[in-house]
Amino acid sequence: CNAIVKEAKENNLTHIFWTESDMILPKDVIPKLLQLKKPIAAGIYFLRGGTGQPCLYKKTPLEIKENPYLHTPITMYDERGPFKVDCPGMGCALMEMGVFDKVPEPWFDLKSNDLGKTNGYGQDLYFYTKVRWAGIEVWVNPSVICDQIETQIVGYKDYRRRLMEGRGLGGGFIGLDAHVVDK
């Protein structure tokens, strides 16, 4: 990833769009993310396993020196409009090149296998922690919904099913907007 950023800078590109090989993206992903007019704009995708867990994270309340890259999963999100997060993953993220002028190198580092992940982290958590330290906001457009492929496609329907079944809510109340309709 660091080499891609350097090449983009050398070619005076304005943005980089990050995705992963197992993503199914909506056809209007780039225009919708550009509409946010934010340094980092992301769509939403859901983690493998069919549980409907969005790949969205906030920083942990207490950072530890041994691993400052820890994040807490966001289990529910506001579907009514754009919102801020600390880490939306790298599966659907559009970034202005100016971000890489404010965040020091290396932008990406992968230590996910260190000590069985006890002190490990993924390149997304590493990068977005440095983004937060640089004071850059990360925004998500909830109208950009992506699916992720494993042995099955997991996506928004899994998220809605999890909410309706009450898994992962800690007994919380769910308010559904009348305009939200499952496809």
Residues covered by each model-derived region:
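Amphipathic coiled-coil/heptad-repeat helices and related helical stalk/stem segments
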Residues: 1, 25-26, 124
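Active-site nucleotide-sugar/metal-binding loop of Leloir-type enzymes
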Residues: 2-15
